[in-house]
Amino acid sequence: MRRGLIMLAPALVAGISFASTRYARAEDVKLPATLTFTAYDTGTAGFNIAVGVGKMMKDKYGTDVRVLPAGNDVARLAPLRAKRAASAAMGSGTYFAQEGVFEFGSKEWGPQPLQILLSTVDCNCGSLGVAADAGVKDLKDLKGKRVGFVVGSPALNQNSLAVLAFAGLTQKDVKVVEFASYGAMWKGLINNDTDAAFGTTITGPAKEAETSPRGLIWPPLPAKDKDGWARMQKVGSFFFPQAATCGAGITPDKPIELGNYPYPIFVAYASQPADQVYAITKAMIVNYDAYKDSAPGAGGLAADRQTKNLVVPVHPGAVKALKEAGQWSDAQDAHNNKLIKRQEVLGAAWAEYGKSNPPSDDKAFLDGWMKARAAALAKADMPNGFED
């Protein structure tokens, strides 16, 4: 591990708050002496990018950044919610957490008002990687095959279902194999416990799988297949077509048409101080050159490469930093305000549902919440997004 970057077990992180009274200064950025980020498992793209950003903060500001790996979305957000981390490097789970669906529809969670600092879209994509010895050429060939799911990670599982939907397949058409974490799922592919796993093309585990005896392929998602993309976006609205030019088994001269969305997405809670979020975001923007080559995918964090008008709002502190970089518009501001209003509607609906004496049974509780959620969004004339 590079100097200044410490990977901690959850038990050790429990005693560390991102709030600090001792600050390190450089230019007009003020960072605490210690910061904690959460990310996907060790070796993943999200983890490696967080490490690269952390090294920059150590080199430029003397800030020690601790990157805490976590195997699912719930584990990534728990330290952030408890104010023991400053940011989480998330994926599409950001959206599911905001919406209060899947695991985030449980009594312990509900809608989470997450807001974005910066996100990255680079030369990589995200899709189902398939063992080369599984007899799969196209996605439709996954029918009857084993597909890895991660317990407690609705994002990864929904992403897998979205890719399957491209080929007209559903969960019933494959054999779901559950794993405890993202890393365990990819180990399962290497060890012949599953045939397919969702991930980014640049994730470390995918590269391990490619060099393993099983090998790895990425079945294509051609952009010209409009029906396939319509099916896929119905399940994962945040996906868009993109040609991957980097990753396991992929080069610029051998691109593969796949799908993508911003990953990682560095998020904070709406309640986190704007000046703190501003400082972190500003540091990432002005020192971009110091970490852009630190890990595959890090280059996409540039201020002028930010995906505009995502389904989750940008934090006011990050908005300030983006405005100063000349990368924010009135149209984005209007869109952002609508998303913040959506989070307020969802939060109010959750509070009201909690007062309605909801069922104690977990499934009945979730079913009741989804109905209350749908009613609140309809009343506010906002799209549901999870009708099916």
Q: What is the predicted function of each stretch?
A:
Residues 32, 201-214, 218, 275-277, ...:
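An extracytoplasmic/periplasmic, membrane-proximal ligand-sensing/linker region
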